[in-house]
Regions:
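Hydrophobic transmembrane alpha-helices of multi-pass small-molecule transporters
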Residues: 63, 177-182, 207-211
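Residue-level signal for short hydrophobic patches within transmembrane helices
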Residues: 14-33, 37, 60-67, 104, ...
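Helix-loop interface residues and adjacent transmembrane-helix termini in multi-pass membrane transporters
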Residues: 33-36, 45-48, 82-85, 159-161, ...
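Alpha-helical transmembrane segments of multi-pass membrane transporters/permeases
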Residues: 89, 102, 157-182, 193, ...
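Short alpha-helical transmembrane segments in multi-pass integral membrane proteins
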Residues: 1-24, 79-144, 187-214
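Hydrophobic/aromatic residues in alpha-helical transmembrane segments
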Residues: 38, 75, 116-117, 150-154, ...
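Interfacial/gating helices of multi-pass transporter permease domains
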Residues: 42-62, 129-136, 192-193
Length: 214
């Protein structure tokens, strides 16, 4: 992160607002497409029961995103303050700490989900007739959930001085997810595991791009 990538001190408020707003909005749109894409491909390629299993397992997705929002928003505020004071090294440490701690925390949650998928599915209220589908998706998704959290955290830090970079990283991640969803579900017939793996790979690519930028 660099302090002068966007001149907050001299740029007009309207221009600054637009410079931050539109890339951020587009990035959020592409982020939402992650979920929408999975729903469309799962529903059309696997069936309604599989789509129901994915939707019932959604609280895990929300938890991972919430973890990312908590660490990302808080950490980015602290980093922004340090950048304003000219402490770029401290701001980079803030980004590293927020990303690593959230990644580790979500990894621990994922391990629990993968160790007890049936119990988690029952807690989430999954009907017995689709519990195997829910187990399949929970195990596959949990293996990559920490990258969703990390991607969310990194997006906040990248937006501090590179809102367009954050937007393009999310765009690339979403496109990869769409392409892999089609390949894994319709071509290779990997089912719900394929849908989760496609999403995970897209998120990993997004994380790599943002880490390279930061």
């Amino acid at each position: 992160m660099q302090r002068d990538s966007i001149d907050f001190g001299s740029m007009k408020i309207g221009q600054l607002f637009c410079k931050q707003l539109f890339p951020t909005l587009l990035g959020m749109v592409f982020s939402a497409l992650f979920v929408i894409t999975d729903g469309v491909f799962v529903g059309r390629g696997i069936g309604s029961d599989a789509l129901a299993a994915v939707n019932i397992a959604a609280p895990l997705f929300v938890f991972a995103a919430g973890m990312g929002l908590m660490f990302g928003m808080g950490g980015a505020i602290v980093a922004s303050i340090n950048l304003a004071r000219g402490k770029e090294r401290v701001a980079n440490i803030n980004a590293t700490q927020a990303t690593l701690v959230s990644f580790i925390d979500m990894t621990l949650v994922s391990i629990l989900v993968m160790a007890f998928p049936t119990s988690v599915a029952r807690i989430l209220g999954v009907p017995e007739d689709i519990i195997e589908l829910a187990r399949e998706y929970l195990i596959a998704y949990a293996a990559f959930a920490m990258f969703q959290t990390a991607l969310c955290v990194l997006t906040f830090f990248t937006r501090i001085d590179g809102p367009k970079i954050a937007m393009w990283c999310m765009t690339i991640s979403t496109v990869i997810n769409i392409v892999l969803d089609y390949l894994f579900i319709f071509v290779y017939k990997w089912g719900l595991t394929g849908a989760a793996v496609a999403t995970g790979i897209g998120e990993i690519v997004g994380c790599i791009l943002m880490v390279a930028y930061l």
